Regions:
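Hydrophobic transmembrane alpha-helices that form the core helical bundles
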Residues: 56-60, 68-131, 140, 296-310, ...
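Transmembrane helix-loop boundary segments of multi-pass membrane transporters
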Residues: 30-41, 115-124, 146-156, 346-379, ...
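Helix-loop-helix junctions that connect adjacent transmembrane segments
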Residues: 7, 122-126, 154-289
């Protein structure tokens, strides 16, 4: 791998890449549909209690692993060992396979708005075919490295920042006018109902505020190294958390919660604003569709590349085939990226044939990633707890407070995550057997297969090591014996 190709992206490019990976405008609408205006304080809670501390954890791990290629594997390896590091990075990659299935229909919906001014209802099979083409394009671009992704992410960041600012200014102007908001912003409306269903939905808010660890896959591509990375990742955490909270507070100024849809919700709130200000709703819909299509496609490219780098770039040599883990000059395992495309291809075809509607297709994919999406962050948190407990003397430039503060903070996060993950996996009003099969059993099966795979590799490696050691010992003994006889 050519070192001249690395260290090529600046701070704003990294901020843009983090922004593209983490901030997803559809999360504002999706959680508003589920929770109403109470999603705003929950987003604020998630930012303060989870996202910012989690960003500090990432910053500390980065500071302690300056030469890491991908981040997550090395972070877990020192505190928990090779097997846990492999399992953590595998689950991170595995969970994201299902996330692509839920994201791609949104990309198509926004492309439809951009070209037609409205959402065209494709059949699930046609949606799957278009998704395959889009994912193939994203996979190809993602193998071009951080410099390409940085440039694309900068365009995404400018567009989404501008779109967000326009909506916030428009909403504030409307609130200062004579016409009241469609749904009044009151303390009662913002007060969340704490029950089992809410705890499960919080899992998605935590996931919406997560993803900053993906940027660590490009640590070696950043000008200024780990010091620049830490500054940018902390700034990104504060900015993104604030945008989620503000956006969630103002989302129902022009459109009621009940009138929003999962696939086109962001366009719907902008066309609602267009009606309020007597602007052309189709024209605004097309403009917003173009920006959101670019934003979603940019996010997909980040998430296409990062999990592959995290899982395949630093695992021990021999776990997979040599060509599968071989990095190109940009530090990307190209063959692994196309293997990932192959898995998603099969899932898209199966989903297309097995779903009666795109909404059902998205719902199935969302259910498959519900609680399991929280497993990789839990691996990182447990690793951090053990790191502060047993390896706190590791040299690093950044620490999240004292040893006890760091351990206490991450312990609270682990408890919150486990409760939320359980509630998400078993939501109220569903068949518990079906929920167990979809949200627990399938993940457990694949995780079990991964565990057997890495255990088999470790046994084989240990046997080879013992054999080599015995051979070396025998050879040395023979040489010594021959030398003695000669004398």
């Amino acid at each position: 791998m050519s070192e001249s190709m690395r260290g090529t992206i600046g701070k704003f490019a990294l901020l843009s890449m983090t922004f593209a990976a983490v901030f997803n405008v559809r999360n504002i609408v999706n959680n508003n549909i589920e929770l109403g205006l109470s999603s705003a304080p929950i987003f604020l809670f998630a930012t303060l209690v989870y996202f910012i501390p989690f960003v500090f954890i990432i910053a500390e791990f980065v500071s302690a692993n300056k030469n890491s290629e991908s981040g997550m594997y090395d972070w877990i390896k020192q505190p928990l060992g090779t097997k846990a590091a492999y399992m953590g990075s595998f689950l991170y990659w595995f969970v994201n396979l299902f996330w692509f299935i839920s994201l791609l229909p949104n990309v198509i919906a926004y492309a439809s708005y951009a070209m037609l001014g409205y959402e065209y209802a494709f059949s699930p099979m046609v949606t799957s075919m278009i998704s395959i083409v889009l994912f193939a394009a994203a996979t190809h671009i993602s193998t071009k490295g951080a410099s390409w992704l940085g440039k694309i992410s900068e365009i995404v960041a400018y567009g989404v920042f501008a779109l967000f600012a326009v909506y916030v200014i428009g909403a504030l102007m409307a609130l200062n006018g004579d016409t009241p908001p469609v749904e009044p912003i009151t303390l009662e409306a913002m007060t969340p109902t704490i029950n089992w269903a809410t705890l499960g939905i919080m899992c998605w808010i935590f996931q919406a505020a997560g993803g900053a660890e993906t940027a660590a896959a490009y640590l070696n591509d950043v000008k200024g190294g780990q010091k620049s990375f830490i500054k940018v990742i902390i700034a990104a955490g504060v900015i993104i958390g604030s945008m989620y909270a503000i956006g969630s507070l103002l989302v129902n100024v022009f459109v009621a919660r009940g009138d929003l849809s999962y696939s086109g919700g962001m366009v719907e709130i902008f066309t609602g604003m267009a009606h309020y200000f007597d602007l052309s709703a189709p024209l605004v819909g097309r403009f917003v569709g173009i920006i959101l299509f670019i934003a979603m496609f940019g996010a997909m490219m980040m998430w296409t590349a990062a999990p592959v780098k995290i899982h395949f770039s630093e695992i021990p040599k021999g776990v997979y085939g040599e060509k599968t883990t071989q990095l190109n000059k940009h530090g990307v395992p190209v063959r692994a990226a196309w293997w990932q495309f192959g898995f998603v291809l099969v899932m898209l075809i199966a989903n297309g044939f097995g779903s009666e509607s795109v909404q059902e297709m998205m719902s199935t994919a969302i259910n498959l990633t519900a609680g399991t999406a929280m497993l990789p962050p839990i691996f990182i948190m447990v690793a951090y707890f053990v790191f502060r407990l047993k390896h706190d003397d590791t040299p690093r430039d950044f620490r999240m407070g004292s040893r006890m503060f760091g351990m206490g903070m991450v312990s609270v996060l682990i408890v919150i995550f486990i409760v939320s993950m359980t509630a998400s996996a078993f939501p109220p009003g569903v068949d518990l057997v079906k929920a167990f099969f979809i949200n627990v059993f399938m993940t457990a099966v694949f995780a079990g297969l991964a565990y057997l795979w890495i255990s088999r590799f470790e046994k084989k490696a240990a046997k080879t090591s013992t054999s080599t050691s015995t051979s070396t010992s025998t050879s040395t003994s023979t040489k010594n014996k021959t030398a003695t006889q000669t004398h």
